[in-house]
Amino acid sequence: IILGTVEVPGGFRFKPPYPKPSSIHPKPHFKVTPNAPLDGPHLGFVHGPEDLALDDQGNPVRIDKAFSWENPMSAHGLMHMVISNAYAGDPYKIDTLFMYMANMSWNSSMNTSGVMEMLTEKDNKGDYIIPRIIYSDAYSSEMVAYADLILPDTTYLERHDCISLLDRPISEADGAADAIRWPVIEPDRDVRGFQSVLVDLGARLDLPGFINEDGSPKYRDYEDYIVNHLRKPDIGPLAGFRGDGSAEGRGPVNPKQIEAYIENGGFYVSHVPEEAKYFKPWNNAYQDWAVELGLYDNPSPYIFNLYSEPMRKFQLAAEGVGERLPPEHLKDRLKKVMSPLPIWYSTEIDNEEKGEYPIHALTQRPMAMYHSWGSQNAWLRQIHGLNPLYVPTKIMRDYNLKTGDWVKLSSIHNSITVPVAEMSSLNENTVWTWNAIGKRKGAWALDPNAPEATKGFLLNHLIHELQPNKGDGHRWSNSDPVTGQAAWFDLKVKLEKTTAPRESQPSFEEIKSPVGVGPKSISWKVRV
């Protein structure tokens, strides 16, 4: 912003439906009435302590503690804390956990070994501490084994999807674009697209948005929802080919909209007018175009703020100003991190572990492992069927290592034993590996001796969802104190060369698969 390189040629440019001022976004809603819809969107932007999701006693309302004093601006929620909090009964106990394609007993959780224990541990009456789990997945993932009720989903090739301007579209800086997926393969098993299942459940539960006045289901399935749902008058999930097929952004329902998208290659783009391409937050031409397309209700120009008033409000609350004040044990932290001007500070983990654990360790997911699905693809398995720990040349020399050797990698929380590979184009004090390539035996319809299950591994075992015990009786989440983002990249480790075990460690008991091992060869019925 200071350099003037935002929304200019050659600089950072917003992609429609952005830019938008934070003030026109919803605030988080959390007031629950039995047998009634939530009072508004559950996620949103907070502008001060008055927007926090707290009860009358100041306790977090959400199971993940999002929008609480622990992480006030947690617009994405804290998925990594849900199971841990439910297990601890903090802020309360739950009777049912309902998740969609979140592999929380494996690669999507911190402290994977501990989370698996939380999912199976029983109380002194012999009941599960987390009594019931409902789960939907397209494959037999590690999480399936822990579910009481499974809703089998379809793959991307077997269902409709909507990549909408109302959500996370495929836009570029010069155009507002959305897209669909549509079935090209007939499912050969008893499965339904999860979106269609949600539409069905909405009608069965008599949710107002899913039933007609006579109580009948409003939508046949998700395809019908994509075409006929209106978020506002004349604005639906898809912006293209509305009305008679010529309207874009705003327009009546077009019963042939899906067919029009398919004919157009599955996407639609509305190009930003030449005179509207730059300075979008202050450009009248862009503002008018965005209103016409339905991105805004009214022109919504705004200026960039280097000084954040919402953050200063939280800092003031920590200083004792205002009606809603944070608990005593969080005041000092909020004073520090809620600076209204940009600041940098080292993490507590970095400060505490500089000596014994001197190396930074990162894990990131390859694109093919979105929801871990890449292990279902024969040619991708040849490319990344296992994942070594990538180690920089300096550490390889310091520890007398060569590619193919094994190391014991330890954090303050746990240890793993894994193979290494040299990577010269890497920060000399950082090691890393891919996430989600390592699989648990019995999952994903893979052979128990597959390389994913014997040589693949997770760095997650080293990362706890809680910070080290401070001796103050509080559970400090291993998350950013402002946004609640999981602190995956704060991990510090040490390593030592070791002899090669039969397979990477830790190794877990094979889970019982509901689908068995995948066939050697397969065939599909393809839609033409």
Please tell me what each predicted stretch does.
Residues 166-170, 176-177, 361, 369-372, ...:
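Short, contiguous, well-ordered secondary-structure segments
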Residues 3, 153, 363-365, 420, ...:
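Pocket-edge structural micro-motifs
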Residues 55-60, 87-90, 122-129, 170-171, ...:
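Intrinsically disordered, low-complexity coil segments
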Residues 147-179:
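Flexible glycine/proline-rich, aromatic-decorated loop/lid segments
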Residues 100, 176-187:
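Flexible glycine/proline-enriched surface loops and loop-helix/loop-strand junctions
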